[in-house]
Amino acid sequence: MALSLLLAVVCAKPLVSRAELRRIQALNPPWKAGMPKRFENVTEDEFRSMLIRPDRLRARSGSLPPISITEVQELVDPIPPQFDFRDEYPQCVKPALDQGSCGSCWAFSAIGVFGDRRCAMGIDKEAVSYSQQHLISCSLENFGCDGGDFQPTWSFLTFTGATTAECVKYVDYGHTVASPCPAVCDDGSPIQLYKAHGYGQVSKSVPAIMGMLVAGGPLQTMIVVYADLSYYESGVYKHTYGTINLGFHALEIVGYGTTDDGTDYWIIKNSWGPDWGENGYFRIVRGVNECRIEDEIYAVYLD
């Protein structure tokens, strides 16, 4: 009985607290930390369920040749010192969304990249919202609200395709188990699918990543998450506090730049809602593989 109560208390540990915030602020991080409304009633256990566990990531076989800087330079040369998808393609920008308690960051980031690159290439003349829910529920090589991985996700979008959010809206916000794969749109009409032409992994070269962003738009990446990220409000994030890896988190890289004091950064679109961070986005140090952000990055090819 005592052990059960102890486990319940551990699992109910709040993700954020003012005491922990003070400890972070005492370290004088190069970014602003605060109490995030998004996580004020979330436990650490619930937060972990929003992330991707290591056992949900497949062994990396190295079978997918990375896109090299030489290939990128054939697409864009010289590579500009800064790029922001929101400024370059304002007609394509959609608000940052909130995945809720479902561990579906893998789907939100992939669908974001898919739609943004379609718009950047002129396939869609304006921003179209594609369905995260269809991908979560129907990509059976992934784990629904319990995480997913890059290659099975992009394989699904290449061979099966994505439908629109108008057809299948997101319903797993408060779920930890994915809803069944729908046979028709929410209104009963047939599901129309839009396929990717293929996908590729970008090399770990920072210039190659920058060039691929400029050449075709946002890319998908993944980071290791530590406790301090949940407190992020603004600035260029650098891991400052917390030694425990809480899980992996898939994200959308939408640009890069350099601060006035010379700090290079990536611009990231998150899936924790528009009230977190910088209107749902955050910046993270570029060029030092901060939180493994430059380890594994994917681009989608479109007709």
UniProtKB/Swiss-Prot annotation:
Compartments in which it is found: Vacuole
Keyword Thylakoid: no
InterPro entries assigned to the protein according to its UniProt record, in alphabetical order: Papain-like_cys_pep_sf, Pept_asp_AS, Pept_cys_AS, Pept_his_AS, Peptidase_C1A, Peptidase_C1A_C
Keywords from the UniProt entry: Disulfide bond, Glycoprotein, Hydrolase, Protease, Signal, Thiol protease, Vacuole, Zymogen
Main location: other
Gene Ontology molecular function, alphabetical: cysteine-type peptidase activity
Gene giving rise to this polypeptide: CP1
Record-linked Pfam families: Peptidase_C1
Signal peptide start and end residues: 1-19
Record lineage: Eukaryota, Metamonada, Diplomonadida, Hexamitidae, Giardiinae
Name recorded for this polypeptide: Cathepsin B-like CP1
